[in-house]
């Protein structure tokens, strides 16, 4: 069998093997894993001499591992395996062996096997496990034995003590027992072995020393700390911390020694013990010496700077400060311990801020958690004593300084986009820290930041364009953030009132900024910041309107900037600025339109085959599509400033026409080419339609803001946009087979609603004909139904006749979509969306008292299909359809209320029927009982309906209870007789209590509770 196994492994891992043969080999090896005898053959193959190939030995050992970990081996088998591996290790790793030691990957696998045996036999069966491998490490000149011993110790920790791994309760108990046994039997000798190895190899083998230190760092979390914190051990580790290579290269031993101290400090212990330990280890001196060492001090700012060491020290300081803060947060600590902790905090704060200010952001980020903990603690203290308050200025200064671009940064360089993104992420973290400082001492932040900004403007006045853009950017960035102090409902405190001092300082900053001429500075980052700030603090310009012409002039100039990142971002910011200040800038609408008219022509570019599909859509995306998306903001901006209340309607129409006429001409030129299949022409038509819709959105948004309700645009405006709608409908009629064109038209239609008013209604049949073509997907139909809901709501008093004409063809398209075959997940999702929007559309019709249109002479032919479709949706309880089901039940309940006639039964303590049903539609009373009521019990009996455990199903149950009550109110005794004579006998239940609740309880809850109990008892 040995040869068969070896052959199978060789075939399976040979890339040149026949695929069919390889498949057979893998199948054979998988069978071996479950064969209770295979492990014996495999261990023999692994340990035999001469050795077979490494891949065969590795796979054999993997099969053995599987057998041990899955507990295939009994006690006798484990004993045999122990003896086999112990003999093998003694033969290969004894130091004087003839056999060569295994390569690293095989040693790892062997260590794993031995660790599994340790778990299974250390308690009973291999009590000498540690001694056996320690003996190898203690032999003179036996480096392989030392490495194996340390590998095993590391693996044991990973198996039984690694807190990052999730464990079952049984595994956790087993691991705790093993740790207790180790502490009892072998921990003293293990700790002594670490000392011996450090002493023996400190000047001989860095690899052994590094591994020993890492092993100590792992084990220290669960052993007696005094085994590590003693004079002998410290005297061995300290020299390693202070090592410096003359060449300036990294030192893994030194870094590991620092990490070991970090793990020691992180060990959980009483606050008083933690403070004592930090003092005993003299970590303040250690950290200070490390930060003063050449790799972190003399070589700062050079390629020799040791970032690995800096990160290691940062981890140590982060752990130290976090632990000291935890001591201070503990309200139960004695005064002596608190005093020591406060002194430690003062001792380590300079080191913390030095690392926080490190030029490498990864070093800075390492200490942010402890700085956050410190600031959180200070915020909880309340009124700060001088001991704490004197810490804040250096902390805030460090935060602000770190927000500055470093000297090597090259803003806007395409090659540095990743660095730029990382820096912006760091700025977000720093902003949170700055907020934390403000929450502790707001006035300190106000004063420091005010001085920073004032000094910047003073320097700008003196140096002009010679001033470093990084300093300007920092000051502008702080102005941008300053509003969180000055304005209400911002920052950590969520203030309901602004800070008067901060608001006053912000107003001064804004005035200085506008007056400084900074908008003419040469660096693009500064220009962007300027526009961002003007847009953010638009309320300043509402109060200080004298600055608006100057700022608006700057915006008009900057939207023409030749830097693409500025130009496209400025289009959006310009739109935001004029939108929020439309009332103040409307008087110069004509001038603004003329000034930016050269930016309005649309030039669609078809993406090439090499276009980056993953291109970001943010401001760093300069693709043609992204540029056009930004260009649309200009159209909306024009709509905003053209439609203010101060602008005469005739002028509004004139402005709209001046922008749209070139678009009409351009579209008429491209439609014929688009019909011929020219992709550029299709895209051009798409873009023009989007621009028309976006312009309309600007007008509609302005009217809505003025009226605070459904806009009623002036005839001069609606006439112009009626022409736009006609032009779009022409394009839609010619190109409605093209999905992108339909999407653009649908978007434009939704935006035109606000400026067309009731004038849109006569065009509705054309919109439906165009947007719901044979090519339309269910997703498109769902989106259009959502738009029609808006139309019905806005024009409910005028829409009846139009709705009466268009309803049947509309519903026929919807019915067709509902019955389309499903091919894959996307189709299923689109169908769910169509179901939801269909029943929501019918719900809106009924809610707005337009239900008569559903049963009018024009639409009677589709009424049966309408009801049938709604019932089908109501009883479809698949995942993703429960919302549609609930709405469908609500729709049926509304139909029952509207067409069931007057109430003939009263619900109360003495229920009674006062007459025969008189439905508005003949026969509808019996229809409700048979179909609506029958539907309710069909759903209740569905195994997938679980209202006891699912919230959405519970909502459906509420609707079911509601519709049952409506049916009873409309039909009275006829419904009761049906329940007693048909429903209850068919279900085999006693419905007496249900009938009592249904006829006496005006609330749905008792009925729902009874139904829940029924379902719970029957499942």
From Swiss-Prot:
Keyword Ion transport set for record: no
GO molecular function: small GTPase binding; tRNA binding
Keywords: Cytoplasm, Nucleus, RNA-binding, Transport, tRNA processing, tRNA-binding
CC annotations in GO: cytoplasm; nuclear matrix; nuclear pore
TM region(s), chain numbering: none
Pfam family, one: Xpo1
Cellular localization per UniProt: Nucleus; Cytoplasm
Signal peptide span: none
Gene Ontology biological process terms from the UniProt entry: tRNA processing; tRNA re-export from nucleus
SS bonds (residue pairs): none
Its job: tRNA nucleus export receptor which facilitates tRNA translocation across the nuclear pore complex. Involved in pre-tRNA splicing, probably by affecting the interaction of pre-tRNA with splicing endonuclease.
Family membership noted in the UniProt record: Belongs to the exportin family.
Protein name per UniProt: Exportin-T
Organism this protein belongs to: Chaetomium globosum (strain ATCC 6205 / CBS 148.51 / DSM 1962 / NBRC 6347 / NRRL 1970)
Gene: LOS1
């Amino acid at each position: 069998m040995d040869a068969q196994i070896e052959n199978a492994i060789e075939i399976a891992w040979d890339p040149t093997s026949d695929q069919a043969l390889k498949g057979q080999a893998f199948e054979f090896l998988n069978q071996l894993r479950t064969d209770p005898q295979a492990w014996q053959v495999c261990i023999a193959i692994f340990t035999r001499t001469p050795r077979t190939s490494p891949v065969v030995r590795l796979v054999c050992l993997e099969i053995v591992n599987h057998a041990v970990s899955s507990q295939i081996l009994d006690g006798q088998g484990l004993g045999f395996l122990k003896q086999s591996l112990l003999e093998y290790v003694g033969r290969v790793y004894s130091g004087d062996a003839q056999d060569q030691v295994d390569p690293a990957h095989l040693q790892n696998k062997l260590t794993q096997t031995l660790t599994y045996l340790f778990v299974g036999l250390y308690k009973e069966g291999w009590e000498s496990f540690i001694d056996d491998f320690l003996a190898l490490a203690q032999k003179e000149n036996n480096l392989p034995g030392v490495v194996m011993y340390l590998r095993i110790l590391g693996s044991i920790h990973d198996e039984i003590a690694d807190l990052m791994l999730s464990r079952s309760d049984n595994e956790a108990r087993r691991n705790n027992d093993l740790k207790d046994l180790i502490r009892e039997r072998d921990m003293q000798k293990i700790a002594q072995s670490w000392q011996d190895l450090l002493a023996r190899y400190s000047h001989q083998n860095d690899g052994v020393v590094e591994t020993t230190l890492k092993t100590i760092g792992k084990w220290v979390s669960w052993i007696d700390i005094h085994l590590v914190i003693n004079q002998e051990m410290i005297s061995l580790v300290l020299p390693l911390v202070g090592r410096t290579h003359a060449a300036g290269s990294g030192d893994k031993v030194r870094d590991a020694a620092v990490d070991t101290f970090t793990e020691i400090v992180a060990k959980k212990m009483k606050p008083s013990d933690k403070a004592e330990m930090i003092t005993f280890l003299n970590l303040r001196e250690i950290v200070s010496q490390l930060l003063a060492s050449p790799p972190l001090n003399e070589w700062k700012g050079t390629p020799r700077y040791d970032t690995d060491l800096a990160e290691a020290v940062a981890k140590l300081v982060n752990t130290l400060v976090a632990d000291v803060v935890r001591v201070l947060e503990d309200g139960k600590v004695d005064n002596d311990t608190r005093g020591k902790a406060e002194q430690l905090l003062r001792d380590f704060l300079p080191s913390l801020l030095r690392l926080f200010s490190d030029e490498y952001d990864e070093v800075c980020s390492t200490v942010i958690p402890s700085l956050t903990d410190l600031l959180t603690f200070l915020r909880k203290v309340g009124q700060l004593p001088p001991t704490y308050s004197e810490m804040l200025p250096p902390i805030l200064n460090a935060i602000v300084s770190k927000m500055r671009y470093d000297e090597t940064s090259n803003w806007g360089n395409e090659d540095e986009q990743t660095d730029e993104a990382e820096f912006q992420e760091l700025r977000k973290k720093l902003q949170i820290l700055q907020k934390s400082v403000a929450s502790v001492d707001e006035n300190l932040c106000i004063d420091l930041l005010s001085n920073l900004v004032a000094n910047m403007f003073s320097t700008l006045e003196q140096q002009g364009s010679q001033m470093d853009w990084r300093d300007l950017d920092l000051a502008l960035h702080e102005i941008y953030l300053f509003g969180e102090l000055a304005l209400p409902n911002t920052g950590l405190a969520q203030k309901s009132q602004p800070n008067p001092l901060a608001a006053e300082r912000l107003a001064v900053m804004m005035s200085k900024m506008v007056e400084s001429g900074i908008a003419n500075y040469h660096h693009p980052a500064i220009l962007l910041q300027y526009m961002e700030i003007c847009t953010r603090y638009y309320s300043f310009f509402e109060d200080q309107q004298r600055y608006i012409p100057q700022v608006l002039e700057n915006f008009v100039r900057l939207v023409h900037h030749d830097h693409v990142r500025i130009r496209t971002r400025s289009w959006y910011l310009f739109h935001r600025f004029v939108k929020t200040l439309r009332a103040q800038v409307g008087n110069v609408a004509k001038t603004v339109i003329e000034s930016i008219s050269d930016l309005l022509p649309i030039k669609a570019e078809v993406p090439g085959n090499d276009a980056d599909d993953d291109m970001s859509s943010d401001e760093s995306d300069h693709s043609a599509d992204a540029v056009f998306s930004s260009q649309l903001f200009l159209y909306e901006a024009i709509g905003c400033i053209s439609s203010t209340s101060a602008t005469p309607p005739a002028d509004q129409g004139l402005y709209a026409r001046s922008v749209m006429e070139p678009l009409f001409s351009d579209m008429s030129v491209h439609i014929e080419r688009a019909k011929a299949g020219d992709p550029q022409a299709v895209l051009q038509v798409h873009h023009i339609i989007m621009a028309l819709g976006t312009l309309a959105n600007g007008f509609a948004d302005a009217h809505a803001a003025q009226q605070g309700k459904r806009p009623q645009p002036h005839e001069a405006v609606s006439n112009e946009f009626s022409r736009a709608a006609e032009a779009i409908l022409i394009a839609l009629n010619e190109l409605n087979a093209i999905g992108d064109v339909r999407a653009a038209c649908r978007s434009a239609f939704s935006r035109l609603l606000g400026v067309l008013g009731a004038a849109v209604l006569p065009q509705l049949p054309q919109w439906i004909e165009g947007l719901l073509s044979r090519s339309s997907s269910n997703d498109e139909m769902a989106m259009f139904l959502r738009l029609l809901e808006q139309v019905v709501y806005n024009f409910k008093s005028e829409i009846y006749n139009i709705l009466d004409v268009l309803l049947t063809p509309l519903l026929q398209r919807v019915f067709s979509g509902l019955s389309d075959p499903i091919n894959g997940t996307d189709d299923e999702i689109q169908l769910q969306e169509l179901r939801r929007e269909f029943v929501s559309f019918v719900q809106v019709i009924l809610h707005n008292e337009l239900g008569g249109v559903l049963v009018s002479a024009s639409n009677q032919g589709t009424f049966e299909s309408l009801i049938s479709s709604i019932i089908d949706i109501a009883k479809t309880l698949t995942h993703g359809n429960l919302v549609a089901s609930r709405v469908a039940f609500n729709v049926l309940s509304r139909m029952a209320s509207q067409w069931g006639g007057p109430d003939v039964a009263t619900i109360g303590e003495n229920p009674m029927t006062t007459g025969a049903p008189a439905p508005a539609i003949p026969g509808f009373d019996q229809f409700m009982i048979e179909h609506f009521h029958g539907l309710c019990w069909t759903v209740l009996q569905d195994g997938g309906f679980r209202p006891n455990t699912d919230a959405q199903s519970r909502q459906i149950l509420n609707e079911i209870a509601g519709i049952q009550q409506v049916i009873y109110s409309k039909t009275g005794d006829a419904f009761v007789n049906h329940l007693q004579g048909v429903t209850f006998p068919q279900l085999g239940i006693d419905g007496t209590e249900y009938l009592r609740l249904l006829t006496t309880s005006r609330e749905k809850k008792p009925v729902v509770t009874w139904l829940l109990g029924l379902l719970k008892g029957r499942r």
